[in-house]
Amino acid sequence: LGSDLNIRCFRAEDLDRVMTINLECLPENYSSYFYIDLHRRFPKTFLVAEVEGEIQGYIMCRIERGFSKLHTFRPMKLCHVVSIAVREPYRRRGIGTALMLEAMRNGRKEYGTGECYLEVRVTNEPAIRLYEKLGFVKVGKRRSYYLDGEDAWIMAIAINGVK
């Protein structure tokens, strides 16, 4: 894919496109306020992926203070992946990987996060494989996490350079 892929920070004018991709790809949908609020608070970890100038995917994260998902009772800042989606025709081309890596880099560099974590449907094998390939490990399960009652794996990774 290479040179025609551009990962950049979300801008307000991207909102309609990102909401459309979210509706197209995921059953978990959000109000426009939710997107704008996350962008206002954590602009460096709300990213879009452009292919030939058109947005085909996004990632948005929330920066949280809490405890390590990988070590007991270790307080730290966490990068929580709230939502990531890539349009079906553009999947399996490294776009999700590029979004994840850039969001984790920015989380570390801009907000001082030590770990990244996310929830993923237990049946979403392609996503689980992607996260495992990136180095995420399953650290727990949330029962009936999704509105339809499906469980979620909680997966986490230490972001490089953790002191």
Segments from the language model and where they lie:
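Conserved Rossmann-like nucleotide-binding pocket used by diverse enzymes
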Residues: 6, 80-82, 116
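Conserved N-terminal entry element of GNAT/NAT acetyltransferase domains
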Residues: 1-12, 161-163
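Conserved glycine-rich acetyl-CoA-binding loop
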Residues: 83-101, 110, 115, 121-129, ...
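Conserved hydrophobic/aromatic "anchor" residues
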Residues: 35, 58, 130, 136, ...
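Acetyl-CoA-dependent GNAT
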Residues: 12-89, 100-111, 158-162
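C-terminal "cap" of GNAT-fold acetyltransferases
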Residues: 114-117, 121-125, 134, 144-163
